[in-house]
């Protein structure tokens, strides 16, 4: 125990000291302990781009505070970190810098790990993983094979972006305004084989289990419900004229089916080619389809394109009324949704209404508001609400909801339709024609067909390039990788050259953290059972659908493969706000980026952490403020000065007084009120900003104990409050609090201490503030004892000098007392 003599807190020396201590002692390494309640805290792992940004600082600091708090509450805390390391940016950087993606990636990981350690984050670095490591994706390849054997993976032809100049497939991210990012030549769609995960097999469970996720923001659950998009309605076939084929449609509004006046097909619909083959419209329709597909590449996905279509020259028949219905190809029909064919009812669908107006197609109202007549010529927009049916055969006069059920039953009875439940969700296409991804463990044999790579031959590794000219060349351009032997028949065969979507790696990494060095299987079942599910997951709302939905899917698959016993991966989810400056998100293009490295160098990690926690609640955006950072630094130095100025009193070792003076009682009460407020703010909603504010009030109270530079509170009462300040702030500013804790003579680091408990009796105030109203208007306030009777409060209120002015001798009709809050005097 040594009296600190520096005028200011030396953050550089102290932070380096404690970071070294934590690393050498593996302070935050953890193993399973059946005698302790586990708590698994996880933030979404980062892509190793090269440097952390303020969004990382905020996200990871929030998680670190929770992890440190839970440790002090006695939990066995798992708090791991790793790297989502595959992806397109590494390929781009490797080509730009004439290096290999693995070199670029691991260099970035080394630098970013150092940055995270400089923030004082309490990670179990023994569990660190990079998804580009063959030891990681070897287990992923085994999962692929097990899913294939269970019927959860299949191969089919799909449409991709193709560049003729580069002779390669491009990811959507590589297509810029319809052109190849590399050669700037026009990209066009091409059909190719691709691998798919059957996520639709789990659509109903994924939807139903959202109701279990009560610890998730409702916004995220709603987004997933909408993405899964369950619909119930009618599946119905429209027979094509002069052809054996039928057009199958699905509609959620069977009550409008008598109003069909044309049929719309997606440009990619397989029937389009059959409809136009050998007709005088063949070339015109093909040109239109080509134009629409190219326009799709260029268009802004947030903008609604102009509706365009072309008549195929063919007709189909409405099975309900026998109407002859022209068949169009339309740019607003998507092959991914429904059947890729839409029965068009312009009177009751706005897109169809606009299309019909443009191409002079009939508009036939069949559902109208009760008691109203509708003239199609007078319609300015589609009638989309339910109502009563007209022009609908035997169903005329029925209400929409009643008619829907009867129309479906009629179609089923007649054999041209049936009830159907559909989902907007589509199977997950995981094939990527990139180099920097996990190879798909499949061999193609002319004799045996599709053959999984034997488990004992995993991993299928990416080829390493000695020739830098071939860095990142797609696998289909590498004969040394492609050519192999069939494990079944021993004949020459070829490897699959697609790699997996990088979302695959991030869909199960949280489970792998429970046994990251396990080599016998993707997961150690016993360890997974102990740690999972994740108790608290933290990340941006931009991942609400894809990553979070895929992780839920993988959890259910891992359960069905026998690895897990849980249904959902994340019990609670916090989607933190962005860090913004000048009203917009920080970005290089806007020139408003604040580099955490510079901030830590100037102010230290603890100040950086404190600002990121104090400036806003975690779920809201944080507005950058230089003044806020400086204020956080001043606050820590204020505590430091208090401890150094009162070092002798704080380390005197006096016993806590049996009888408290008035000053002691005030400080003691404030101390326990602060413990209560901070505990509740962290425990209930992670509102660290109000928790820090409460500690600031306690620090102010500490300074208020001094008159003429001498404490009027007993040293032991003073020390108890200072201990609370350090304990309560330690999850937020761990270096500073550890150092001050040891300076005050403690022998064990602060993270080994229990979280302070509050005495509920000690938090209670002696006096209440009662508001006095006269005729409902506030006229005065009085202080009264907590245990005062109501009639005594009324007497004091009536005697109050300010109230007397407003009563002015008038007779009092009655008094109304709201317990412990106010008295209203009615005159």
From Swiss-Prot:
Record's GO cellular component terms: cytosol
Binding positions (ATP): 588
Transmembrane segments: none
SUPFAM superfamilies linked to this entry: Anticodon-binding domain of a subclass of class I aminoacyl-tRNA synthetases, Nucleotidylyl transferase, ValRS/IleRS/LeuRS editing domain
Gene Ontology terms, MF aspect: aminoacyl-tRNA deacylase activity; ATP binding; leucine-tRNA ligase activity
A Pfam entry, by short name: tRNA-synt_1g
Reaction catalysis annotation: tRNA(Leu) + L-leucine + ATP = L-leucyl-tRNA(Leu) + AMP + diphosphate
Annotated InterPro entries: aa-tRNA-synth_I_CS, Leu-tRNA-ligase, Leu_tRNA-synth_edit, M/V/L/I-tRNA-synth_anticd-bd, Methionyl/Leucyl_tRNA_Synth, Rossmann-like_a/b/a_fold, tRNAsynth_Ia_anticodon-bd, Val/Leu/Ile-tRNA-synth_edit
EC number: 6.1.1.4
Intracellular or extracellular location(s): Cytoplasm
Domain of life: Bacteria
Predominant location category: cytoplasm
Family (UniProt): Belongs to the class-I aminoacyl-tRNA synthetase family.
NCBIfam families the UniProt entry points to: leuS_bact (TIGR00396)
Protein name in UniProt: Leucine--tRNA ligase
Source organism per UniProt: Desulfotalea psychrophila (strain LSv54 / DSM 12343)
Gene from which this protein is expressed: leuS
